[in-house]
A protein has these predicted regions:
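Conserved C-terminal portion of the radical SAM core fold
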Residues: 59, 114-118, 140-202, 213-235
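Core AdoMet radical
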Residues: 29-41, 54-69, 81-99, 111-143, ...
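Flexible, acidic/Gly-rich N-terminal and inter-domain linker regions that tether
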Residues: 1-11, 23, 203-204, 208, ...
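Short, charged low-complexity linear segments at domain edges
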Residues: 1-9, 231-255
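Canonical Radical SAM [4Fe-4S] cluster-binding loop centered on the CxxxCxxC motif
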Residues: 4-42
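Flexible mid-to-C-terminal extensions adjoining Fe-S/redox cofactors in radical SAM and related proteins
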Residues: 241-294
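Short Fe-S-cluster ligation motifs
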Residues: 47-67, 286-294
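Distinct, well-ordered alpha-helical segments
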Residues: 71-78, 99-109, 168-176
């Protein structure tokens, strides 16, 4: 895989560390491969860190599953801390390998309290989570990983990718977070990227935002009323009710972010997430907002 140069002018500086993954999520935008790539990418990423601009605000570590690097992930984090002391680290992981407390402590410690862990929760119900993750016991291992991260006082971004198998339970997920995961730093409800496995499993997993907005509305406001920080990623403002706009983030990496012809006359375009260039089709129901009227 050819990695993009690290650049302080972009909103996405990422170290891709492996195409391997111990999950096989039904909507994965970058399906895993059985590639013997960890050592090669590790050496490549060490060099990229050494040559990176020193003013990067944040750098991502992603895959595949970064924790499959084992101790090499810790070495990578230490190298970032040494070479880029002012840069935060954002690790995207399914969280399962953080079930090992000793390993979790070492990863968190290496980051010197400047790591954000982006961890997915697919459902409050273990069966649905495991189906979506494509792996048995994924739910229990992820939950154990989340608790271990919390015990290490890690910063946790809980990610809920909305799909056909979980959108009916969005409010239940919010209640589950309140009762069982009150330590997460924030929760992000995310629109799907229509590429990779999401296309292959479209009939099973794909759902349009216009089908779940009312469920999302209830889930977001439930967490907000309980004073949990809550965000919405990857869903254009025109598809959200006006009361959800304050939660929407411009979350899409600039290298795969696009706005459509219908967006040209929209008064909220500058604040909107837009869409994915990587998606085979845009969301249904996109429209122009004039003078704030939805």
């Amino acid at each position: 895989m050819i990695q993009r140069p690290l650049d302080s002018l972009t909103n996405d500086n990422t170290l891709f560390c492996t195409e391997q993954c111990n999950n096989h999520c039904l909507m994965c935008c970058q399906p895993p491969k059985k590639a013997d790539d960890i050592d090669i990418l590790f050496q490549e990423n060490l060099l990229r860190i050494k040559n990176a601009p020193k003013d990067l605000p944040i750098i991502g570590i992603t895959g595949g599953e970064p924790t499959l690097l084992g101790e090499k992930l810790i070495d990578l984090i230490r190298q970032i801390r040494e070479q880029l002391p002012g840069t935060d680290i954002h690790i995207l992981s399914n969280g399962r390998n953080f079930k090992d407390m000793s390993y979790t402590e070492k990863v968190v410690s290496a980051g010197d309290r400047r790591i954000i862990f982006g961890i997915p929760l697919h459902s409050d119900y273990s069966g649905d989570h495991d189906i979506i993750a494509g792996c048995r016991n994924a739910f229990y291992e992820t939950i154990q990983g989340l608790y271990n991260l919390a015990l290490c006082e890690a910063c946790i971004e809980l990610r809920v990718v909305i799909n056909k198998l979980n959108y009916q339970r969005l409010h239940c997920i919010s209640e589950f977070i309140n009762k069982n995961l009150p330590f997460v730093t924030w929760t992000a409800f995310m629109g799907m990227e229509y590429t990779g496995y999401a296309v292959e499993h479209s009939n099973q997993i794909w759902v349009e935002p216009i089908e779940y907005i009312s469920k999302l509305q209830k889930a977001v406001h439930t967490l907000d009323e309980w004073h949990y920080k809550t965000c919405i990623y990857n869903i254009p403002l025109c598809l959200l009710t006006e009361d959800l706009h304050e939660f929407a983030e411009q979350s899409i990496s600039d290298w795969k972010n696009e706005y459509y012809e219908i967006c040209d006359g929209c008064t909220l375009k500058a604040k909107c997430s837009g869409g994915f260039t990587t998606s085979i089709k845009p969301y249904q129901g996109l429209h122009t907002i004039k003078n704030g009227e939805i």
